[in-house]
């Protein structure tokens, strides 16, 4: 699966339910039909606590046995145990985690075939160094990982074509965008709520294949204008 023109403009993980991306959410194991796509929402239910726990435990046990599953959305709160179970799905190519109580990303490193990854709000995470194992990653989206300051690992993901870094209302503070400068294959980049200390977009000057850049209004206008002059084919929104 290569990125489409629409992916490059609006992002790979954009919602397109008319195409079953994601499919309808599933709460109970018996609702899953063995398809290649699964939208799992097994937490934040109205079940009593003991039944809720049993439900999550059942999914944790079952997920590693789903040999046909290729794309998994986890659209309710994700525990560390549930995340680790998802990372054991053998043929997984795409994983979307909306948000959760995850404090360790390292289990994802065992999924060397992973190509598309979104990690939503997970404020306990302090390091993304484990992503260095995912050399085949094509799309990476990280959201509200405010305790992560070192983005250097991103520069080693040379196959990345799509990158999104979201900070939300609380700005995500990082030193600079230097790691992004090494992503020669990058085609879209979303930087919303991210605040490099030097406020510079210069690391993007050499990204010849970059076609879409999404920024929030807080970026210095002189930086944005200079980038547009140097990269006239770049669409900045």
Locate the predicted segments by residue.
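Concave beta-strand-loop units of leucine-rich repeat
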Residues: 2-237
